[in-house]
Protein backbone atom coordinates (compact mmCIF):
# COMPACT_ATOMS: atom_id res chain seq x y z
CA UNK A 1 0.00 0.00 0.00
CA UNK A 2 1.31 3.39 -0.96
CA UNK A 3 1.29 6.15 1.62
CA UNK A 4 -0.45 9.43 0.75
CA UNK A 5 0.53 12.63 2.48
CA UNK A 6 -3.08 13.51 3.35
CA UNK A 7 -5.65 11.33 5.05
CA UNK A 8 -9.26 11.78 3.91
CA UNK A 9 -11.98 12.29 6.50
CA UNK A 10 -13.99 9.29 5.24
CA UNK A 11 -12.07 6.60 3.38
CA UNK A 12 -15.28 5.15 1.94
CA UNK A 13 -16.32 8.45 0.34
CA UNK A 14 -13.07 9.17 -1.53
CA UNK A 15 -10.91 7.83 -4.35
CA UNK A 16 -7.19 8.25 -4.94
CA UNK A 17 -4.72 8.28 -7.82
CA UNK A 18 -0.99 8.90 -7.96
CA UNK A 19 1.87 8.96 -10.41
CA UNK A 20 5.57 8.72 -9.65
CA UNK A 21 8.62 9.86 -11.62
CA UNK A 22 6.45 11.55 -14.26
CA UNK A 23 8.47 13.23 -17.01
CA UNK A 24 6.84 16.61 -16.73
CA UNK A 25 8.26 19.77 -15.24
CA UNK A 26 7.74 20.11 -11.48
CA UNK A 27 7.11 23.86 -11.62
CA UNK A 28 4.45 23.61 -14.31
CA UNK A 29 2.80 20.70 -12.51
CA UNK A 30 2.69 22.64 -9.25
CA UNK A 31 0.85 25.54 -10.90
CA UNK A 32 -1.69 23.21 -12.57
CA UNK A 33 -2.27 21.44 -9.23
CA UNK A 34 -2.82 24.70 -7.36
CA UNK A 35 -5.37 25.77 -9.98
CA UNK A 36 -7.50 22.60 -10.05
CA UNK A 37 -7.43 21.93 -6.29
CA UNK A 38 -10.96 22.30 -4.89
CA UNK A 39 -12.66 22.13 -8.30
CA UNK A 40 -15.56 19.86 -9.13
CA UNK A 41 -14.23 16.90 -11.13
CA UNK A 42 -16.31 17.64 -14.24
CA UNK A 43 -15.31 21.31 -14.10
CA UNK A 44 -11.64 20.28 -13.82
CA UNK A 45 -11.92 18.12 -16.96
CA UNK A 46 -13.47 21.03 -18.86
CA UNK A 47 -10.74 23.38 -17.63
CA UNK A 48 -7.94 20.99 -18.64
CA UNK A 49 -9.51 20.54 -22.10
CA UNK A 50 -9.69 24.32 -22.48
CA UNK A 51 -6.02 24.67 -21.52
CA UNK A 52 -5.08 22.11 -24.18
CA UNK A 53 -7.00 24.14 -26.77
CA UNK A 54 -5.56 27.46 -25.45
CA UNK A 55 -9.05 28.73 -24.52
CA UNK A 56 -8.08 29.12 -20.84
CA UNK A 57 -4.65 29.55 -19.27
CA UNK A 58 -3.10 28.21 -16.07
CA UNK A 59 -2.16 31.11 -13.77
CA UNK A 60 1.47 31.10 -12.63
CA UNK A 61 1.61 32.47 -9.09
CA UNK A 62 4.80 31.11 -7.53
CA UNK A 63 7.10 30.06 -10.36
CA UNK A 64 6.41 33.06 -12.55
CA UNK A 65 9.86 34.47 -13.30
CA UNK A 66 10.05 35.20 -17.00
CA UNK A 67 6.49 34.03 -17.63
CA UNK A 68 4.71 36.14 -20.23
CA UNK A 69 1.47 37.95 -19.68
CA UNK A 70 -1.87 37.03 -21.16
CA UNK A 71 -5.41 38.32 -20.79
CA UNK A 72 -6.63 34.81 -20.01
CA UNK A 73 -5.06 35.13 -16.56
CA UNK A 74 -7.54 37.83 -15.56
CA UNK A 75 -10.20 35.30 -14.56
CA UNK A 76 -7.83 34.15 -11.78
CA UNK A 77 -6.69 37.66 -10.84
CA UNK A 78 -3.19 37.38 -12.32
CA UNK A 79 -1.49 38.62 -15.45
CA UNK A 80 1.09 35.86 -15.88
CA UNK A 81 -0.26 32.60 -17.26
CA UNK A 82 0.74 29.77 -19.58
CA UNK A 83 -0.61 26.64 -21.27
CA UNK A 84 1.55 23.75 -19.92
CA UNK A 85 0.03 21.04 -22.14
CA UNK A 86 2.33 18.21 -21.06
CA UNK A 87 1.54 18.70 -17.36
CA UNK A 88 -2.14 19.07 -18.20
CA UNK A 89 -2.11 15.72 -20.03
CA UNK A 90 -0.61 13.97 -17.00
CA UNK A 91 -3.22 15.54 -14.69
CA UNK A 92 -6.00 14.59 -17.11
CA UNK A 93 -4.88 10.95 -17.05
CA UNK A 94 -4.57 10.91 -13.24
CA UNK A 95 -8.03 12.45 -12.84
CA UNK A 96 -9.45 9.83 -15.21
CA UNK A 97 -7.83 7.16 -13.02
CA UNK A 98 -9.29 8.71 -9.85
CA UNK A 99 -12.70 8.92 -11.55
CA UNK A 100 -12.55 5.21 -12.46
CA UNK A 101 -11.53 4.36 -8.88
CA UNK A 102 -14.48 6.40 -7.57
CA UNK A 103 -16.85 4.64 -9.95
CA UNK A 104 -15.54 1.26 -8.78
CA UNK A 105 -16.30 2.32 -5.18
CA UNK A 106 -19.83 3.35 -6.20
CA UNK A 107 -19.47 7.06 -5.45
CA UNK A 108 -21.76 9.69 -6.96
CA UNK A 109 -19.85 11.04 -9.98
CA UNK A 110 -21.63 14.42 -10.03
CA UNK A 111 -20.63 15.26 -6.45
CA UNK A 112 -16.90 14.49 -6.74
CA UNK A 113 -14.58 17.32 -5.73
CA UNK A 114 -10.79 17.41 -5.86
CA UNK A 115 -9.94 17.56 -2.16
CA UNK A 116 -6.17 17.10 -2.25
CA UNK A 117 -3.53 17.57 -4.94
CA UNK A 118 0.16 17.43 -4.16
CA UNK A 119 3.16 17.66 -6.45
CA UNK A 120 6.61 16.68 -5.20
CA UNK A 121 9.87 16.98 -7.08
CA UNK A 122 11.29 13.62 -8.11
CA UNK A 123 15.06 13.03 -8.41
CA UNK A 124 16.51 14.89 -11.37
CA UNK A 125 17.43 12.84 -14.40
CA UNK A 126 20.88 13.63 -15.71
CA UNK A 127 22.01 14.00 -19.30
CA UNK A 128 24.80 16.04 -20.85
CA UNK A 129 25.25 18.49 -23.66
CA UNK A 130 28.58 19.13 -25.33
CA UNK A 131 29.91 22.69 -25.50
CA UNK A 132 32.69 24.51 -27.24
CA UNK A 133 36.34 23.91 -26.33
CA UNK A 134 35.70 20.37 -25.09
CA UNK A 135 33.46 21.29 -22.18
CA UNK A 136 30.40 19.37 -21.02
CA UNK A 137 27.32 20.91 -19.34
CA UNK A 138 24.69 19.08 -17.30
CA UNK A 139 21.32 18.73 -19.00
CA UNK A 140 18.86 17.93 -16.19
CA UNK A 141 15.14 17.20 -16.23
CA UNK A 142 12.82 17.90 -13.28
CA UNK A 143 10.26 15.09 -13.04
CA UNK A 144 7.36 15.03 -10.58
CA UNK A 145 5.47 12.80 -8.17
CA UNK A 146 1.74 13.68 -8.22
CA UNK A 147 -1.01 12.48 -5.89
CA UNK A 148 -4.72 13.29 -6.11
CA UNK A 149 -7.62 12.56 -3.75
CA UNK A 150 -11.21 13.15 -4.88
CA UNK A 151 -14.14 12.92 -2.48
CA UNK A 152 -17.88 13.32 -2.51
CA UNK A 153 -19.06 16.74 -1.46
CA UNK A 154 -20.51 16.64 2.03
CA UNK A 155 -24.11 17.67 2.49
CA UNK A 156 -24.40 21.00 4.25
CA UNK A 157 -26.08 20.70 7.63
CA UNK A 158 -28.83 23.31 7.98
CA UNK A 159 -28.21 25.82 10.70
CA UNK A 160 -30.53 25.82 13.70
CA UNK A 161 -33.07 28.63 13.82
CA UNK A 162 -32.61 29.23 17.54
CA UNK A 163 -30.61 32.39 17.87
CA UNK A 164 -29.62 33.42 21.34
CA UNK A 165 -29.76 37.18 21.64
CA UNK A 166 -26.71 38.47 23.41
CA UNK A 167 -27.19 41.44 25.71
CA UNK A 168 -24.49 43.55 27.21
CA UNK A 169 -24.24 44.19 30.93
CA UNK A 170 -25.75 47.64 30.44
CA UNK A 171 -28.71 46.28 28.45
CA UNK A 172 -29.30 43.57 31.06
CA UNK A 173 -29.27 46.12 33.87
CA UNK A 174 -31.79 48.31 32.01
CA UNK A 175 -34.09 45.33 31.48
CA UNK A 176 -33.92 44.35 35.16
CA UNK A 177 -34.61 47.95 36.26
CA UNK A 178 -37.57 48.17 33.89
CA UNK A 179 -38.97 44.86 35.20
CA UNK A 180 -38.49 46.06 38.80
CA UNK A 181 -40.33 49.34 38.06
CA UNK A 182 -43.21 47.47 36.45
CA UNK A 183 -43.44 45.21 39.49
CA UNK A 184 -43.50 48.24 41.84
CA UNK A 185 -46.06 50.25 39.86
CA UNK A 186 -48.39 47.29 39.31
CA UNK A 187 -48.42 46.42 43.03
UniProtKB/Swiss-Prot annotation:
InterPro entries: Ribosomal_uL22, Ribosomal_uL22_CS, Ribosomal_uL22_euk/arc, Ribosomal_uL22_sf
Highest classification ranks of the organism: Eukaryota, Fungi, Dikarya, Ascomycota, Taphrinomycotina
Keyword Ribonucleoprotein set for record: yes
Keywords tagged on the record: Cytoplasm, Ribonucleoprotein, Ribosomal protein
Protein name in UniProt: Large ribosomal subunit protein uL22B
Any one of the GO BP annotations: cytoplasmic translation
Organism of origin: Schizosaccharomyces pombe (strain 972 / ATCC 24843) (Fission yeast)
Gene: rpl1702
Assembly mode: Component of the large ribosomal subunit (LSU). Mature yeast ribosomes consist of a small (40S) and a large (60S) subunit. The 40S small subunit contains 1 molecule of ribosomal RNA (18S rRNA) and at least 33 different proteins. The large 60S subunit contains 3 rRNA molecules (25S, 5.8S and 5S rRNA) and at least 46 different proteins. uL22 is associated with the polypeptide exit tunnel.
CDD domains, A to Z: Ribosomal_L22 (cd00336)
Subcellular localization(s) per the UniProt record: Cytoplasm
Superkingdom classification of source: Eukaryota
Family from the record: Belongs to the universal ribosomal protein uL22 family.
Its biological purpose: Component of the ribosome, a large ribonucleoprotein complex responsible for the synthesis of proteins in the cell. The small ribosomal subunit (SSU) binds messenger RNAs (mRNAs) and translates the encoded message by selecting cognate aminoacyl-transfer RNA (tRNA) molecules. The large subunit (LSU) contains the ribosomal catalytic site termed the peptidyl transferase center (PTC), which catalyzes the formation of peptide bonds, thereby polymerizing the amino acids delivered by tRNAs into a polypeptide chain.
GO MF entries: structural constituent of ribosome
General remark: There are 2 genes for uL22 in S.pombe.
Gene Ontology cellular-component terms listed: cytosol; cytosolic large ribosomal subunit; preribosome
